[in-house]
Amino acid sequence: TLKMEDYQTIIHEASYISACSPVVNSSGQVVNGANNAPTSVYGINQDYMEIRKYSVGEGEMFTDQDIRRAAKVCVVGKTVVENLFTNGEDPLGKTIRFGKIPFKIIGVLTPKGYNSMGQDQDDLILAPYTTVQKRILAITYLQGIFASAISEEMSGEAIDELTAILRQNHKIKAGDDDDFNIRSQEELSSMLSSTTDLMTILLACIAGISLLV
């Protein structure tokens, strides 16, 4: 299992990593009045935007304070807006519900469209990872950690560094198997990649099963 300590160690000790975000996610129905649609909510920090090449087109991104407070705020993709605000209303400042949890929309993502795998990159909700952990999933661990290497050339070093950090944190003895998986963007692009920019080296440390969508 990946813990917050793993994330903290990576951001304090990893020299080949330029951005790093905890990741927890959940799929379910999102509701606004009489409108509802299936979608996924991703609990992340601000670095996730850089790693996955997302940007806020309207409104703003949530803050470190929102993360500390596990605030019920979110940034939504264009598809979510179209599904929930069918009359073209401005979604900013409106409250939607994911499961039983109300979220105030503070930002709308710049549309990215579909990726090469045919996945809609605008059908998602981004929220502070603490909010998704505590209020939706009721867990303290992380489902994944997304990171990007300082350059494509350094991706091998970044993977080696992450492996060493996690093995030490998890107290894995020499010769014993890892209890985590690390996938690079190259591997993911042939599996479950959700980004069209294959030049971005995305290193995902996934505990147990790969919860990568």
Q: Where are each of the predicted segments found?
A:
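Hydrophobic alpha-helical segments typical of transmembrane helices
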Residues: 6-9, 80, 128-131, 141, ...
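Structural beta->alpha junctions
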Residues: 1, 15, 30-37, 108-114, ...
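Short aromatic/basic micro-patch
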Residues: 1-4, 43, 74-75, 126, ...
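Glycine-rich active-site/cofactor-binding loop and its immediate structural neighborhood
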Residues: 212
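Mid-to-C-terminal secondary-structure elements
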Residues: 47-62, 66, 71-175
